[in-house]
Regions:
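Carbohydrate-associated surface elements
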Residues: 41, 160, 180
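Conserved acidic donor-binding segment of nucleotide-sugar-dependent glycosyltransferases
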Residues: 325-337, 345-350
Length: 406
């Protein structure tokens, strides 16, 4: 098959969507498909990339680290028409997603759409008043429904997201396919003990320290502040515990100030963002992965952490249902007391449970190979259907015009 992937974010950017699309391209090519990626310009992108086409872009208002491609590119459209695409798979609701659907209409080929991001959790970046935020969330729900209903098939990473789209009145068939990870990349056996100890020493972590680790985007919706605010109480009688935060984002300075105000800078360590190619080593800084986020569609960092042999202690969320088995590969929590009990059970393990080994075992079904095979099955099913591009285009045009003129 000749497959076009349209995305607003791609390697070398570090985020769940970029990783997912990069991995999908890699694995589909391994199977034998021809895969073309259409994405945005981004700082640090390689000069030469096989079958990757980049369009001029601007920073995204909703998620400032992301970029949005400039709308319809005639030269790129001409090139796409020569590629003999069989199917277009969009990974964005914004300009490149719309561009992908326009091209699918012109080429009379089907569109599959993956819904990666729960945008209702990001509207606070645009609005600072409750009424405005309520309206923004309503707009997001309608816009999401339109984007999903104009595809022949929708893919989501978890049942949590499928249920959300059904509430939005998405009527297209929805397939739940967890995004996989390159399990080999996070294998702890790849890293020498000496290298891990050296990295821990670089950040002032002693060999016998017990380390909570958060790795990912540092932003309001990730709710890292809840963990930070609990640390003075938790560490009061547990002097050997440290909390390491790896990553960057708009909340970084605020959380650093919060940490300084609590006089915890020696216990809570911010490493800043780190290169994706070396991220497996940074997971080895931790003894347990911790998160209070409830904005995840799937939580790829949970999967990466478990693949790296780290048990997870995370705030209870439906996206964890298939990943976390409390008491076996980690714990969930709803309040501070449950957070502390979960951490203590892992740090001071007196029950003989091999949390880290169990975490690795659980992740076998989340391999990138399995992910690509499941997506390929969706492609094959969609290709066998009869569909009428004109009907889809009419629906899209009508709904988008209505959305922007009411």
């Amino acid at each position: 098959m000749n497959i076009g992937l349209f995305t607003e974010t791609y390697y070398p950017e570090i985020n769940g969507v970029a990783n997912s699309v990069y991995m999908l391209k890699t694995e589909l090519e391994e199977i034998g498909h021809n895969v073309y990626v259409f994405t945005t310009t981004t700082p640090g992108a390689p000069e030469f990339e096989h079958n990757v086409f980049r369009v001029p872009s601007l920073p995204c208002i909703l998620i400032t680290e992301r970029r949005v491609g400039l709308f319809y590119q005639p030269k790129l459209a001409s090139l796409i028409k020569k590629l003999n695409l069989d199917l277009i798979h969009t990974h964005t609701e914004f300009s490149l997603g719309i561009f992908g659907r326009i091209m699918a209409k012109e080429l009379k080929i089907p569109t599959v759409h993956t819904y990666h991001t729960i945008y209702e959790d990001y509207t606070h970046y645009l609005t600072h008043r409750k009424l405005l935020d309520k309206r923004a969330k309503a707009f997001v729900r309608v816009f999401t429904k339109i984007c999903c209903n104009t595809a022949e098939q929708v893919i989501v990473p978890t049942e949590k997201v499928r249920e959300l789209l059904l509430k939005y009145s998405v009527f297209r068939e929805i397939s739940v396919i967890p995004t996989g990870v390159n399990l080999k990349k996070f294998n702890p056996d790849l890293h020498l003990k000496e290298d891990v100890l050296k990295l821990r020493e670089e950040f002032g972590i002693k060999p016998d320290d017990k380390v909570l680790l958060y790795l990912g985007r540092i932003s309001k919706e990730k709710n890292i502040g809840e963990i930070i605010e609990a640390m003075p109480e938790y560490m009061r009688e547990r002097n050997q515990v440290k909390f390491v935060i790896v990553g960057g984002g708009p909340e970084m300075e605020h959380l650093k100030q919060l940490t300084a105000d609590m006089n915890m800078m020696d216990k809570i360590i911010f490493t800043g963002p780190k290169p994706w190619d070396n991220i497996g080593l940074y997971y080895q800084l931790g003894d347990v992965f911790v998160s209070a986020s409830q904005s995840e569609t799937q939580g790829l960092t949970y999967i990466e952490a478990m693949a790296a042999g780290l048990p997870v202690v995370a705030k209870k969320d439906k996206c964890l249902d298939d990943i976390l088995e409390p008491g076996w590969n980690g714990y969930d929590f709803t309040d501070r007391d449950e957070l502390f009990k979960g951490l203590d059970a892992i740090f001071f393990n007196n029950n003989g449970i091999s949390y880290g080994e169990n975490a690795k075992l659980r992740m076998r079904k989340y391999s990138s190979e399995e992910f690509a095979k499941n997506v390929e099955m969706v492609y094959e099913e969609v290709m066998q259907r009869d569909f009428i591009s004109e009907q889809r285009a009419a629906y899209e045009t009508k709904k988008i015009n209505h959305l922007f003129h009411t």
